[in-house]
């Protein structure tokens, strides 16, 4: 009787783990759609400073036909596929191609971008907003060529630095737990 209970608990844990792993990954239709962006690899891996024309045209068609796939790619962790993908450069790809995209804040992992609120009518009074650049303490101001953000390799911890647990490792761990009850 105890063995049945442990198998049932293990089975429920396995189903829950598999469900959470598959829920976090893009759908297969989005994976095939995103693979059409292969001409963009040289840009998002840092091997090119500007995206190619085929990259920009394919990105434009993906954004027009399947914007939910772009949201899915942004919301999912970058899998370890042997490529050194620069997430910052990947997120700057639409700007580099001069392509308008919905703001990332409108991405919803389940449904893709949501509709934008209607623009205020010309008769409505909207407050004037002045945008001014801000600077960090100790930053120099004045004439210069701008600044570049360079990612640093620190010793601090961050949840973004942790790779997701691979499915095959999870399956191996479940197998070990299941077979350990026979020992």
From Swiss-Prot:
<feature type="glycosylation site" description="N-linked (GlcNAc...) asparagine">
    <location>
        <position position="86"/>
    </location>
</feature>
<keyword id="KW-0336">GPI-anchor</keyword>
<feature type="disulfide bond">
    <location>
        <begin position="69"/>
        <end position="107"/>
    </location>
</feature>
<dbReference type="GO" id="GO:0008289">
    <property type="term" value="F:lipid binding"/>
</dbReference>
<keyword id="KW-1015">Disulfide bond</keyword>
<keyword id="KW-0472">Membrane</keyword>
<comment type="similarity">
    <text>Belongs to the plant LTP family.</text>
</comment>
<keyword id="KW-0732">Signal</keyword>
<dbReference type="GO" id="GO:0015908">
    <property type="term" value="P:fatty acid transport"/>
</dbReference>
<dbReference type="InterPro" id="IPR016140">
    <property type="entry name" value="Bifunc_inhib/LTP/seed_store"/>
</dbReference>
<feature type="signal peptide">
    <location>
        <begin position="1"/>
        <end position="24"/>
    </location>
</feature>
<feature type="disulfide bond">
    <location>
        <begin position="40"/>
        <end position="55"/>
    </location>
</feature>
<keyword id="KW-0449">Lipoprotein</keyword>
<feature type="glycosylation site" description="N-linked (GlcNAc...) asparagine">
    <location>
        <position position="47"/>
    </location>
</feature>
<comment type="function">
    <text>Probable lipid transfer protein.</text>
</comment>
<feature type="disulfide bond">
    <location>
        <begin position="56"/>
        <end position="97"/>
    </location>
</feature>
<protein>
    <recommendedName>
        <fullName>Non-specific lipid transfer protein GPI-anchored 15</fullName>
    </recommendedName>
</protein>
<dbReference type="InterPro" id="IPR000528">
    <property type="entry name" value="Plant_nsLTP"/>
</dbReference>
<dbReference type="GO" id="GO:0005319">
    <property type="term" value="F:lipid transporter activity"/>
</dbReference>
<dbReference type="GO" id="GO:0005886">
    <property type="term" value="C:plasma membrane"/>
</dbReference>
<feature type="compositionally biased region" description="Polar residues">
    <location>
        <begin position="149"/>
        <end position="158"/>
    </location>
</feature>
<dbReference type="Pfam" id="PF14368">
    <property type="entry name" value="LTP_2"/>
</dbReference>
<feature type="propeptide" description="Removed in mature form">
    <location>
        <begin position="159"/>
        <end position="183"/>
    </location>
</feature>
<dbReference type="GO" id="GO:0009845">
    <property type="term" value="P:seed germination"/>
</dbReference>
<dbReference type="InterPro" id="IPR043325">
    <property type="entry name" value="LTSS"/>
</dbReference>
<keyword id="KW-1003">Cell membrane</keyword>
<keyword id="KW-0325">Glycoprotein</keyword>
<feature type="lipid moiety-binding region" description="GPI-anchor amidated serine">
    <location>
        <position position="158"/>
    </location>
</feature>
<feature type="disulfide bond">
    <location>
        <begin position="30"/>
        <end position="71"/>
    </location>
</feature>
<dbReference type="GO" id="GO:0010214">
    <property type="term" value="P:seed coat development"/>
</dbReference>
<feature type="region of interest" description="Disordered">
    <location>
        <begin position="108"/>
        <end position="158"/>
    </location>
</feature>
<dbReference type="GO" id="GO:0098552">
    <property type="term" value="C:side of membrane"/>
</dbReference>
<dbReference type="InterPro" id="IPR036312">
    <property type="entry name" value="Bifun_inhib/LTP/seed_sf"/>
</dbReference>
């Amino acid at each position: 009787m105890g063995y049945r209970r442990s198998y049932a608990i293990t089975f429920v844990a396995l189903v829950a783990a598999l469900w959470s792993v598959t829920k976090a990954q893009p759908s297969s239709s989005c994976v095939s759609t995103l693979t059409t962006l292969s001409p963009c690899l040289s840009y998002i891996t840092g091997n090119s400073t500007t995206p190619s024309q085929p990259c920009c045209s394919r990105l434009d068609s993906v954004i027009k036909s399947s914007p939910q796939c772009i949201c899915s790619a942004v919301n999912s962790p970058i899998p370890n596929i042997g490529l050194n993908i620069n997430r910052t450069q990947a997120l700057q790809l639409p700007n580099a191609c001069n392509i308008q995209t919905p703001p990332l804040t409108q991405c919803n992992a389940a449904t893709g971008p949501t509709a934008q609120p209607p623009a205020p009518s010309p008769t409505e009074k909207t407050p004037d907003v002045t945008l001014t650049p801000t600077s960090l303490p100790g930053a120099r101001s004045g004439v210069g060529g701008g600044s570049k953000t360079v990612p640093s390799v620190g010793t601090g911890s961050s949840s973004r630095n942790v790779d997701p647990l691979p499915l095959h490792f999870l399956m191996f761990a479940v197998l070990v737990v299941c077979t350990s009850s026979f020992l």
